[in-house]
């Protein structure tokens, strides 16, 4: 299983083996959602000579925001698809089979991957709760404590 945590500034790719994270092969990429927003605005400036408010970009990420002019919305959608392809390529580069490996996207970017990543196969799940990371570490901590108590006990 592979957990892909897409946060504000980073994307963490963490394999889970026997219900435990394998930190020896965990990879962090500096390609979080904020970098995606920055890239969208670079393209808007390049093509239209003006930026889009971060709030408007986030609204497109979350629900499509049909109230933006088409020329801006088209750039945003194109860049979101490119961003998702970049994340998918990270996973492939690490040697994971996108059709077979159970992949769980978590964090704020899980919604972006679900809406724009075009990955709807059965082995892919999306946990869109922005507190999922903290809840996951809490869960893993409890498993670790239970195992430690059993060994010592």
Language-model segments: residues:
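Helical "lid/coupling" subdomains associated with nucleotide-phosphate turnover
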Residues: 1, 33-153
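Short, flexible active-site loops
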Residues: 20-28, 68-69
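Glycine-rich, phosphate-binding/catalytic loops in enzymes
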Residues: 19-22, 121-123
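Gly/Thr-rich phosphate-binding beta-strand-loop-beta motif of the actin/hexokinase/Hsp70
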Residues: 1-20, 40
């Amino acid at each position: 299983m592979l957990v892909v945590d897409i946060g504000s500034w980073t994307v963490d790719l963490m394999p889970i083996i026997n219900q435990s994270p394998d930190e020896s092969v965990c990879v962090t990429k500096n390609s979080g959602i904020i970098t995606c927003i920055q890239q969208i605005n670079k393209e808007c400036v390049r093509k239209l000579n003006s930026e889009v408010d971060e709030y408007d970009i986030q609204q497109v990420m979350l629900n499509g925001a049909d109230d933006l002019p088409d020329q801006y919305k088209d750039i945003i959608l194109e860049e979101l698809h490119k961003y998702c392809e970049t994340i998918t390529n990270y996973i492939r580069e690490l040697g994971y089979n996108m059709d077979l490996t159970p992949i769980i996207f978590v964090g704020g970017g899980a919604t972006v991957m679900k809406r724009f990543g075009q990955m709807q196969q059965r082995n892919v799940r999306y946990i869109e709760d922005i507190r999922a990371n903290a809840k996951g570490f809490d869960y893993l901590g409890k498993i670790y404590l239970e195992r430690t108590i059993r060994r010592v006990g």
